[in-house]
């Protein structure tokens, strides 16, 4: 489902543990890490899509909703990365959810019916902005920045996430 402007409605999920680290997942068969995300089906609310996508991508929906972004955040997908030829397709528009994981780590199961991820780890809250593919960077920055006050996170140590001199690696752990 693509809207009139060429954007596919989607949900993004920032899953926090008790230390406010976030779940960072490695895409299957790629050297790319990201937050879980997925499309919103016809007649589905963003919240319904979020719970369905959690089950499909990380094998559990044992989360509590802390908050969500006020509106849609958009990014354009470079033409070279389009999976199929879609004349109207420009990118994704996303509602982001900040979630508290309430299960045991053993309940995170990436071996789902159609696996999208092959590994995961807990990382510092702001680290994904530095590590995500460049065309998603601003949306990650906006989502993390808008939702950070809900868990009393300090502002990030940089001002513009799209300037390479402001990027710095941060090590994560499981």
From Swiss-Prot:
Entry keywords, A to Z: Hydrolase
Taxonomic superkingdom: Bacteria
Chain location of the short sequence motif Nudix box per the record: 38-59
EC numbers, comma separated: 3.6.1.-
SUPFAM superfamilies reported in the protein's UniProt record: Nudix
Gene3D superfamilies: Nucleoside Triphosphate Pyrophosphohydrolase (3.90.79.10)
A Gene Ontology cellular-component term: cytoplasm
Span of domain Nudix hydrolase: 6-145
NCBIfam families xrefs: PRK00714.1-3 (NF001936), PRK00714.1-4 (NF001937), PRK00714.1-5 (NF001938)
This protein's name: RNA pyrophosphohydrolase
Source organism: Acidithiobacillus ferrooxidans (strain ATCC 53993 / BNL-5-31) (Leptospirillum ferrooxidans (ATCC 53993))
Gene name of the encoded protein: rppH
């Amino acid at each position: 489902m693509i809207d009139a402007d060429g954007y596919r409605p989607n949900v993004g999920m920032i899953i926090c543990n008790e230390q406010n680290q976030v779940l960072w997942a490695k895409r299957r068969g790629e050297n790319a890490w990201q937050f879980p995300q997925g499309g919103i089906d016809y007649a589905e609310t963003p919240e319904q899509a979020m719970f369905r996508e959690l089950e499909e991508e990380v094998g559990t929906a044992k989360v509590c909703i802390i908050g969500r972004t006020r509106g849609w955040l958009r990014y354009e997908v470079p033409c070279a990365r389009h999976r199929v030829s879609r004349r109207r397709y420009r990118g994704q528009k996303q509602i982001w959810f900040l979630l508290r994981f309430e299960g045991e780590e053993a309940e995170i199961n990436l071996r789902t019916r159609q696996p999208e991820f092959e590994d995961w780890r807990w990382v510092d809250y702001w680290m994904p902005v530095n590590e995500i593919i460049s065309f998603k960077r601003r949306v990650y920055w906006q989502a993390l920045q808008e939702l950070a006050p809900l868990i009393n996170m300090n502002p990030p140590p940089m001002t513009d996430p799209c300037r390479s001199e402001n990027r710095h690696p941060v090590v994560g752990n499981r």
